[in-house]
Amino acid sequence: MQLAGKRALVMGLGVHGGGTGVARFLALQGADVTVTDLRGPDDLRASLDALAGLPIRFVLGEHRDDDFRRAEIVVRNPAVPPNSRYLQIARAAGATIEMEMTIFFRLCPGPILGVTGTKGKTTTTLLLGAMLREQFPDTVIAGNLRISALEQLPTITATTPVVLELSSFALEGLGEAGLSPKIACITTIAPDHLDRHGTMEAYILAKEQIWRHQRPGDAVALNADSPIIRAMAVVEQRPDDVVWFASAAHPALAHAGRAAFWQGDELVWRDHRGGRHVICTRDDVQLRGTHNLGNIAAATAAACSFGVAPDHIRRAVQTFPGVEHRLELVRELDGVRYVNDTAATAPEAAIAALRTFDDPIVLIAGGADKQLPFDDLAREIAGRVKAVVLVDGTATPKLQRALRLVDPSVDVCGPFDDFERAVIAARHIAAPGDIVLLSPGCASFGMFRNEFHRGEAFRRIVESFT
């Protein structure tokens, strides 16, 4: 892929550095780089500082049609929809449309393992990376983790495993380019990002791109617990390439080939000959929540498909501490535990968090709308939660209506347009033995830059309590 001397336009720098890695990479490859973003320099200060000193032209606060007409390569941020009118201008002028991930896939010399899913993909990606690093210490972990894959390229050889977290947005671009990883893994699928994809069918199709362009002999690890995933065409088209995983001995596994599943307290790997190998037990697991048993099985299925030895997998499970912003214990104060699960940006993820705890929960929920239903989350709240503190946002009225329909007696406080006041209100409601759980079930846009900004604010507020 020739980049030197090419007129390259990066569309969308991003407030948390989403485009800095590809902009830096293109500049260092000798491309004539322009970065364009609708946000102004004040909003993008951290990203601009990260690119200081590089020969990059910036067009901020607007997109200019002429920039798209003159570009030979346009690299779109995953947040930019593929049907953007600016991309249509670029295509009409003969430009190639890329994403950071498509460039990386074309240039990466090592084998790629990709993980996607509505929930569980970050934990599974990092755990899979830890499993591989036990056997292959040079393993690279990147993707949808605020870690630029392109910046890791100089360290990657033909034998370096690369583990990538792949969002549905990134997979759209990979699908257009006809690219899939050697080992693919789909953790779960439930409604999410329907504000972007429009329909559940379109969202599923985006997720399916992770396996649709694989080569013969590649593998795809699929969740037997999910009816949506079990119905995917790859199951009939390439049965020998499918590796199953499940949080229990699911009936769908009875006649399947390779599989990783929990049987009682043991995680079992069944190889292609039908041999049974105990990988670990529940006593080896540090992660909270039954949903994380599924994540461990998913990572195990992918790791075993790549040839990682059971002992290496066991060591990774025993030492894996979890992921920040996901069921993260911030502190315990006056007998109350404060748990940061800000990464739960969809109702399904918040439901999984609520099912993790047996103690009374004061839930902090609400936020920006992704066109998702809240009926199931409302039922879970009514059955499990001591009180819910609502944060203002475009989705919050939908959650309020769902709660009123399910159980008008649910103790609801708010909504608050000040996040600190919401956290303080939750503290006042909680009693010794309770859990204050930030698991919003919604996106964060409007009040915060992103969900991680929201989680950091929660940490800061809780750590300030005396």
Swiss-Prot record:
GO terms for molecular function: ATP binding; UDP-N-acetylmuramoylalanine-D-glutamate ligase activity. GO terms for cellular component: cytoplasm. ATP binds at G117, T118, K119, G120, K121, T122, T123. It is found in: Cytoplasm. It comes from the Bacteria. It is an enzyme of class 6 (ligase). Keywords: ATP-binding, Cell cycle, Cell division, Cell shape, Cell wall biogenesis/degradation, Cytoplasm, Ligase, Nucleotide-binding, Peptidoglycan synthesis. Cell wall formation. Catalyzes the addition of glutamate to the nucleotide precursor UDP-N-acetylmuramoyl-L-alanine (UMA). NCBIfam families: murD. This is UDP-N-acetylmuramoylalanine--D-glutamate ligase.
